[in-house]
A protein has these predicted regions:
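C-terminal motif of bacterial Sec signal peptides marking the signal peptidase cleavage site
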Residues: 36-39
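N-terminal export leaders
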Residues: 19-24, 28
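Functional surface patches built around histidine and acidic residues
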Residues: 2-6, 13, 21, 48-288, ...
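Bacterial signal peptide processing site
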Residues: 41-45
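Acidic, low-complexity Ser/Thr/Gly/Pro-rich repeat segments typical of extracellular/periplasmic
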Residues: 263-366
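Alpha-helical transmembrane segments
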Residues: 30-34
Length: 366
């Protein structure tokens, strides 16, 4: 199975991110699963795939988001249930269910279906097949063009996003693609963000092009809804911080996969192990005093690199997310222990907090 993936930018932090677009080919791993991960910044558009056929006129520019409301005083209640989605085929339903299973297991609120964002995500999945181009950025005049960037496409279909991410995968069935996405660094940061309340999912399939099964997931909150989006704090976390892999997780993959750009560019991305991570709400900057991964049975410390917003070479990491990336693939059938000692600083108030976590997980057989 080949899985090709690309992570999108945050609409709220695009100014500090680089734009990286293109078609990233899968590279085989020892598990016979090819995983290519790419992260692209700069939500305002950029290059994209070409395409044949008659050009279609671009849609009108989206209506600007309304002015921000006063700062919220506290988090909204986490969405522990959401309505059953309508209109999904088996693959999109599998992606929706798996995405929410991941968030719930990490102590985060679920994401509700947005039919407007579904249309935007589906249009972009169809655009990638029509133009055989795997990128977040559409080009005006190409077949199926609906907007240069994902926030513009969402707005065209009637949804004004505030913050959030678009993550994408290709060449696989949607449920498995979500599992591959959460095994990366940048993709995981988007999936485990506290702030989003809505999701739109698009998925298409064609055997005639290289981008054969594009999955598009837009994750955000509404800029026109003062109860669930604009002016509201993030969904509350039942755990205070979201760790991954979760405590007691089994069959954790051994490798990070071919994430592009490489979060640890000093070595080949395929030589990196599955990261451990901690996420907090978006207005907090998280830092580590100690972040250590050991083999539980022997106590052997695993050589690893901490990646956070303070040292991310690709300028893609949100300040609220920190990862520990092993310098080598994890060992099969092995239990690992993680210890995180750190803290947070709120961007607006300067209030500090303590985040101490310890947990364990077990790896897959191969």
């Amino acid at each position: 199975m080949d899985v090709l993936m690309e992570a999108g930018s945050s609409a709220g932090h695009a100014a500090r991110r680089r734009t990286l677009f293109g078609l990233f080919r899968a590279v085989a791993t020892a598990t016979a699963v090819s995983v290519a991960l790419g992260a692209c910044g700069g939500g305002g558009g950029g290059g994209g795939g070409g395409g044949g056929g008659s050009p279609e006129p671009p849609p009108p520019a989206p209506t600007p988001a309304p002015a921000p409301s006063p700062a919220p005083t506290g988090p909204i209640a986490a969405q522990m249930t959401v309505p059953t989605p309508v209109g999904y085929d088996a693959d999109r339903l599998a992606a929706f269910n798996r995405l929410n299973e991941i968030r719930l297991s990490a102590g985060l609120g679920m994401l509700a279906q947005s039919t407007a964002m579904d249309q935007a995500a589906q249009a972009h999945a169809d655009w990638m097949i029509a133009n055989d181009s795997f990128t977040h950025a559409e080009t005006a005049g190409t077949v199926g063009f609906t907007g240069e960037s994902w926030p513009r496409r969402d707005a065209v279909f009637g949804y004004t996003p505030i913050g959030g991410e678009e993550v994408m995968a290709a060449s696989g069935h949607a449920g498995a693609e979500v599992d591959a996405l959460v095994n990366g660094v940048y993709h995981r940061a988007g999936i485990l963000a506290f702030e989003p309340v809505d999701v739109g999912i698009g998925w298409s399939a064609s055997s005639a092009v290289d981008v054969s099964m594009p999955l598009v997931i837009d994750i955000t909150r509404p800029g026109t809804d003062t109860t669930r989006g604009l002016g509201q704090a993030p969904q509350a976390s039942t755990h205070g911080a979201a760790i991954w892999p979760i405590d007691g997780a089994r069959n954790v993959p051994l490798r990070l996969g071919a994430e592009i750009p490489n979060p640890v560019p000093s070595q080949n991305v395929l030589s990196l192990g599955t990261p451990a991570s901690v996420a907090v709400e978006e207005e907090a900057t998280i830092s580590a005093t100690a972040f250590v991964l050991t083999k539980s049975e022997t106590g052997e410390v695993v050589p690893a690199q901490i990646v956070s917003s303070s040292n991310d070479p690709n300028l893609l990491m949100p300040r609220s997310f920190i990862a520990l990336v092993p310098r080598a693939p994890l060992s099969p059938n092995t239990t690992y222990s993680v210890v995180f000692v750190g803290g947070t600083v709120e961007a607006v108030t300067g209030v500090t907090g303590v985040v101490n976590r310890s947990w364990s997980f077990s790896t897959a057989a191969q």
